[in-house]
A protein has these predicted regions:
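Phosphate-group recognition and catalysis centered on beta-loop-alpha active-site segments
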Residues: 1-299
Length: 299
């Protein structure tokens, strides 16, 4: 007779795999400018020291073709005369040479500790990002020419940062982002917008090459379940600006937002468990209702 067949031991069910929480990008808006003057090397150094892995800044070209960092197209809001007095008359970057810009102080308005701070060049910022091992979020401003966009891309390449750079610009500057992906189909690009609608999605899709990450970078008031679904159906992730409240940040990430441009929130601020969708949407809607049209409309 055949020996009895030993029954196979029962298969232990594998424990359920916990879904990984997405890593949220916290982007230092114009550097960490709660500690140092915005868009200056001290602000970027403060951001890196605080733990930010992503630094945002705005690029303009001078009259003699030097790429410099400043949010506005004029320097009046952030610069002062060398003696600390306010600048009289509008000073537009595109009508000034780099040497002329060096005559102004970009730190003294924030306090004596920053006396003598000069406007940074794009080249030195990219070099800093490389040395600090952080990712630059490069906002293209002032309707640059294709040649100017290519100049910036060349500077990024020379710094060995082509694979790290993120390029962002508003919908009305879509052509500039198209210039970026035409020159480098693998470039990561984000389309800035105050809203999130079908037209925004259609514009962003023109930047998809099949080889790159394209995302929507929208004002936080544009986020709700429907707009997030619209983006997801197009294969677009969503990042937001400018969020300085932890509760709002938690609500936005619970709705699927993967990046937050901020003035104050440190990268360590995350939520262990996402909120219920209806709770998250209610919080976002409350903040949107209270939102007032300020300079935060434009990062």
């Amino acid at each position: 007779p055949q020996p009895p067949v030993e029954p196979e031991p029962p298969v232990e069910p594998e424990p359920p795999v916990e879904p990984e929480m997405p890593v949220i990008r916290y982007v230092a808006h114009r550097g960490y400018h709660v500690q140092a003057p915005e868009n200056t090397m001290p602000a970027f150094a403060a951001a890196a020291e605080a733990g930010y892995q992503f630094l945002e800044s705005d690029v303009h070209f001078t009259k003699d073709g030097v790429a410099v960092l400043c949010h506005d197209s004029t320097i009046n809001a952030t610069a002062r005369n060398a003696d600390g007095s306010k600048i009289v008359g509008v000073k537009s970057i595109q009508f000034m040479t780099y040497e002329e810009l060096l005559q102004y102080d970009f730190g003294i308005a924030a306090g004596e500790a920053y006396l003598g701070t000069r406007i940074p060049t794009f080249r030195e910022w990219i070099a800093f990002c490389r040395e600090a091992d952080v990712t630059p979020y490069i906002e293209l401003k002032s309707s640059m020419t294709t040649e100017q966009v290519q100049t910036l891309m060349q500077l990024v390449e020379e710094a060995g940062m082509t694979d790290r750079a993120v390029w962002i610009s508003f919908t009305w500057n879509l052509r500039m982002l198209q210039d970026v992906v035409a020159a480098n189909p693998e470039a990561e690009v984000g389309l800035l917008s105050n809203g999130l609608a079908n037209t925004t999605v259609a514009m962003a899709k023109t930047l998809q090459t099949g080889q790159n990450r394209v995302f929507l970078d929208v004002l936080h008031t544009a986020v709700n379940r429907l707009s997030m679904q619209l983006a997801a159906q197009a294969g677009l992730e969503v990042e937001v600006y400018t969020v300085n409240d932890e509760e709002l940040a938690d609500a936005l990430t619970s709705l699927g937002v993967v990046g937050i441009t901020t003035n104050t929130l440190l990268p360590a601020v995350t939520t262990a468990e996402p909120m219920q969708l209806q709770d998250a949407e209610a919080i976002v809607a409350r903040f949107a209702q209270d939102f007032t049209m300020t300079s935060e409309l434009e990062p």
